[in-house]
Curated annotation (Swiss-Prot):
<protein>
    <recommendedName>
        <fullName>Pierisin</fullName>
        <ecNumber>2.4.2.-</ecNumber>
    </recommendedName>
</protein>
<feature type="binding site">
    <location>
        <position position="127"/>
    </location>
    <ligand>
        <name>NAD(+)</name>
    </ligand>
</feature>
<feature type="binding site">
    <location>
        <begin position="114"/>
        <end position="116"/>
    </location>
    <ligand>
        <name>NAD(+)</name>
    </ligand>
</feature>
<feature type="binding site">
    <location>
        <position position="85"/>
    </location>
    <ligand>
        <name>NAD(+)</name>
    </ligand>
</feature>
<keyword id="KW-0238">DNA-binding</keyword>
<dbReference type="InterPro" id="IPR035992">
    <property type="entry name" value="Ricin_B-like_lectins"/>
</dbReference>
<dbReference type="Pfam" id="PF22596">
    <property type="entry name" value="Scabin-like"/>
</dbReference>
<dbReference type="GO" id="GO:0030591">
    <property type="term" value="F:2'-deoxyguanosine DNA ADP-ribosyltransferase activity"/>
</dbReference>
<dbReference type="GO" id="GO:0003677">
    <property type="term" value="F:DNA binding"/>
</dbReference>
<keyword id="KW-0808">Transferase</keyword>
<feature type="domain" description="Ricin B-type lectin 1">
    <location>
        <begin position="267"/>
        <end position="409"/>
    </location>
</feature>
<feature type="domain" description="Ricin B-type lectin 3">
    <location>
        <begin position="564"/>
        <end position="707"/>
    </location>
</feature>
<keyword id="KW-0053">Apoptosis</keyword>
<feature type="short sequence motif" description="PN (phosphate-nicotinamide) loop">
    <location>
        <begin position="117"/>
        <end position="135"/>
    </location>
</feature>
<keyword id="KW-0677">Repeat</keyword>
<dbReference type="GO" id="GO:0006915">
    <property type="term" value="P:apoptotic process"/>
</dbReference>
<comment type="function">
    <text>ADP-ribosylates double-stranded DNA by targeting the N2 amino group of dG residues; 10-fold less active on tRNA. Induces apoptosis in a range of human cell lines. May play a role in removing unnecessary or harmful cells during pupation. May play a role in defense against parasitic wasps; its habitual predator Cotesia glomerata is only susceptible after removal of its eggshell or the surface of the larval caudal vesicle, while other wasps are damaged by this protein. The wild-type catalytic domain (residues 1-233) cannot be expressed in E.coli as it is unstable probably due to its toxicity.</text>
</comment>
């Protein structure tokens, strides 16, 4: 592929599919490159969108600030909740499902989600499908990291260059979707605002029109589920709008309305000063006439304001969220002619109404009584904390005019859905919130053990706009700050329900994997972890005032949903990561010992994974004796660490959980002890294999690749088969009908057609040059022969081959079905032979589509 300089990218950070987001960038790049078209190999390569890029208007921006668009038939109640989930989400997707060029050209079902860049050339242009004016359609606005730049990847060969496509493997999380336009037969009905959007800052405002309602979305919004009937026809129909062949670039004229009097939606906002970052309009005294000032973020109701638009006055009233009787007001009638702002009950005066004016990326708030008077941030300290805010005439000085500019931030109290979670500390690696049921009911931080002590069930209360967090260990106990204790203790305990506000928590998203957890009793109090040890072997968990700036309090949390069913039930081979030709094997030997053995593709090495919903773990059944299960005999008097195949006992030592690594492999952990993993040693067993143990040590052989039996890795198509080390060297045949490695000279004899036989779960590999001729296995260390495989003995296993994809290398291994221990490789003299499979470079190949 083309040789270009390395660059920084956010890659797959946006992915909503967890297994894709967890992969190393190198691994996912190999996965996407395996289907690269032959004709483009020398002139193109996979190009991720860089972290810093030159946008279509030639302005240098961060990738998170480049405006992308996606046309979709699915409504906000689905997209703002789940994000853009690709059609294909399963692990080990097949060849076509990871084919970037095929996806860009034909939009077939895949792991990708398509978007298009906003194109700017004095005016704004957007690629638009020709059927966007038919039925109910949504135009989603996206600011996401990473993704693959399709035009940059394929250059002049890009299938639809005017689409300016950015494709996202694994989809796009909801936090990167800012808004959506809802269109009915081409007419914009409303603009949806996503309150969970993670704003990178410095974005242009959402384009709006005074004639179009703006709506802040909430879960299960009654108007948020409008769906066109055609989107229900098939699983893939919602993606038809992004097919590059059915659209063109059109000018986006929506919102070209000077002095739009209604630039923001009605709803709940925080009003942030542009002059003083992280300072917000604040009504700290909840009384009639209470002074409004600018103060550092506290997460409290006193900094939340409810905007409502009056069509008659063409202005907004701004109501305090903490006290619905109080409104943002300028007491223009005061005898002192004061300029400060206060919270007053409704008077009907125009000094309680505000016109909101866009100033590029921000807003000014003008008082309706006197439109010359603008809300202005001051440097003067306020007696109530923070800084004073007044109304003042317009400032023209370019250096100080930002004191009259404000950012409106939609506020949402429900960033996560109800369910079970682990609460990981971001700063202190592998530490989670833990309740071990000790006598003092103390909740603390502890090393992650994947047990019910560390499971927390979040339930949202719409009255309090906050969460109750229930213990997984004891379902009647809630995470509680005992704020009423005489000692004014700051620790956190697990108490039965009291209906006190100190048992409610607000979850505030601060990053893609980062949250603050605030107590509703006092929103300045945040949950944090210190390095101080507790008597129970963990770390001290407490609440402290956010404004105190405690450097020793680690208060950022990654709240991870708990999901244990990583793979579908079915039959698998379990290959070792470090020794890729060794699989877990049970040969029914004395003592029921299970060991690692060179792969031979028989039932000894077949294992059936069966998920148990109650235990939330897998049982792993032998393929050779269906009444035996993969077991660690943890109860043996010798405390043995070996694995055995035993009949069902019901013990947790027969259950296993999968822990995904970042290269697509898994650690297999025993349910009885989270730290006990299946590991392969280099020690020989009496039965000809390698010893398997369960161990809490970090052996190098404790990660495994699961290959599902019966999956078809490649389609029935024609390919050149190139070596791993040099894609310009391919498998061809000699005049004596032996397979050889030659330079690719575009000969027909180096084109091979795959034909899959579903009964044998293997391929015939035919010559495209001579009818009926195909690959024939002769024996170990013999040439692979080209001969007639369509005769009376067509079913001979020597004519069939299995093909395995190697996630680590991005290449394929070709095994003989007749003798699966042997794989196709080549010698120094470039003869193609079969030998014991080792996954060495000379046994790995690229399949290049013709």
């Amino acid at each position: 592929m083309a040789d270009r300089q390395p660059y920084m990218t956010n890659g797959i950070q946006a992915a909503v599919v967890e297994w894709i987001r967890a992969l190393d960038l190198e691994i996912i790049s190999l996965l996407l490159s395996r289907a690269w078209p032959m004709a483009l190999l020398a002139t193109s390569e996979l190009r991720w969108r860089p972290t810093v890029l030159t946008d279509t208007d030639n302005v240098v921006r961060l990738d998170r600030r480049q405006r992308l668009v996606r046309w979709d038939r699915r409504p906000p109640n689905e997209i703002f909740l789940d994000g853009f989930v690709p059609i294909v989400t399963r692990e080990n997707p097949d060849w076509e499902e990871t084919d970037l060029y095929g996806f860009a050209k034909n939009n077939h079902p895949s792991i990708f989600v398509s978007t298009t860049k906003t194109q700017r050339n004095k005016k704004k242009y957007v690629w638009t499908p020709r059927n966007a004016n038919r039925g109910i359609v949504y135009q989603y606005e996206i600011y996401a990291p990473g993704g693959v730049d399709v035009n940059d990847s394929f250059s002049d060969a890009s299938p639809w260059p005017n689409q300016m496509e950015v494709a996202f493997p694994g989809g796009i999380q909801n936090i990167y979707i800012r808004s959506a336009r809802e269109l009915h037969n081409g007419r914009i009905q409303r603009i949806w605002i996503n309150p969970n959007f993670l704003d990178p800052g410095d974005l242009e405002p959402i384009v709006s029109s005074s004639r179009t309602p703006q709506v802040i979305w909430r879960m299960n919004h009654p108007d948020g589920g409008h769906r066109d009937q055609r989107s229900e026809r098939s699983a893939s129909s919602y993606d038809d709008l992004m097919y590059g062949g059915t659209g063109n670039v059109q000018e986006d004229t929506f919102g070209d309305e000077p002095n739009n009097p209604k630039p923001i939606a009605a709803g709940e906002f925080m009003i942030e000063s542009i002059k003083d970052k992280n300072s917000f309009l604040d009504l700290s005294k909840n009384v009639n006439g209470g002074v409004i000032h600018s103060n550092l973020y506290s997460g409290g109701d006193n900094q939340i304001w409810v905007f409502s638009y009056d069509d008659n006055k063409k202005a907004y009233r701004i109501q305090s969220y903490q006290n619905s009787y109080l409104y943002l007001s300028w007491d223009s009638n005061a005898s002192s002619k004061e300029m400060i702002l206060r919270g007053y009950t409704n008077s009907g005066s125009n000094n309680q109404y505000w016109q909101i004016e866009q100033t590029g990326k921000n807003y000014r708030l003008r008082n309706l009584l006197n439109l010359d008077m603008i809300i202005t941030a001051q440097d003067k300290p306020s007696a109530f904390g923070g800084k004073e805010v007044i109304v003042n005439t317009e400032i023209s000085n370019s250096n100080t005019k930002i004191s009259q500019e404000w950012k409106m931030i939609p506020f949402d109290f429900r960033p996560i859905i109800d369910g079970d979670y682990n609460i990981f500390n971001v700063d202190l690696s592998n530490q989670v919130v833990d309740f071990s049921n000790q006598p003092d009911l103390l909740v603390h931080g502890h090393i992650f053990c994947d047990n019910e002590n560390q499971t927390w069930h979040f339930t949202y209360n719409s009255t309090y706009h906050a969460y109750k967090i229930w213990s997984g260990r004891k379902s009647n106990l809630l995470l509680t700050w005992d704020s009423n204790a005489a000692s004014k203790e700051m620790v956190v305990r697990a108490y039965t329900e009291s209906r006190s506000k100190n048992q409610y928590w607000r979850i505030e998203q601060t990053g893609s994997k980062s949250y603050k957890v605030r107590n509703l009793e006092n929103s300045s109090m945040i949950l944090g972890l210190t390095r101080v040890s507790t008597p129970y072997g963990g770390l001290n968990l407490m609440v402290e005032d956010d404004s105190d700036g405690h450097s020793d309090l680690h208060s950022d949390w990654d709240i991870k949903p708990i999901f244990y069913q990583d793979i579908p039930d079915g039959d698998y081979n379990i290959f070792n990561d470090n020794f890729p030709n060794i699989a877990i094997d049970f040969t029914n030997q004395e003592g029921s010992l299970i060991h690692g053995h060179n792969f031979c593709s028989n039932n000894n090495q077949k294992w059936s994974f069966v998920f148990d919903g109650k235990r939330k773990a897998y049982r792993i059944k032998s393929g050779v004796r269906s009444n035996l299960w993969l077991s660690w005999d943890s109860n043996a008097s010798s405390k043995e660490m070996v694995l055995r195949a035993y009949t069902e006992s019901g013990s947790s030592n027969q259950y296993w959980r999968l822990d995904e690594a970042n290269d697509g492999s898994y650690r297999i952990r025993n349910l009885q002890d989270y730290y006990k993993l299946i590991a392969l040693t280099n020690k020989n067993t009496p039965y000809g294999g390698k010893e398997l143990i369960v161990s809490d040590n970090k052996e190098s052989g404790n990660t495994w690749y699961l290959k599902k039996l019966g999956e078809v890795p490649l389609p029935n198509r024609k390919f050149r088969i190139a070596t791993k080390l040099n894609y310009k060297k391919v498998i061809d045949s000699s005049t004596s009908y032996n397979l050889i490695i030659t330079h690719d000279l575009n000969f027909a004899s180096s084109i091979w057609e795959l034909v899959y036989d579903s009964s044998k779960k293997a391929y015939n590999i035919y010559s495209s040059d001579i009818n009926n001729l195909g690959w024939i296995y002769q024996n170990k260390n013999f040439f692979v022969k080209l001969g007639n495989i369509d005769g009376p003995d067509h079913g001979d296993l020597r004519y069939f081959w299995t093909i395995e994809y190697s996630m680590q290398t991005g290449c394929y291994l070709i095994r003989s079905l007749h003798d699966p221990a042997n794989a196709v490789g080549y010698t120094d003299s470039e003869s193609v032979i079969t030998d014991t499979s080792t996954y060495s470079d000379n046994q790995l190949f690229h399949f290049i589509l013709m």
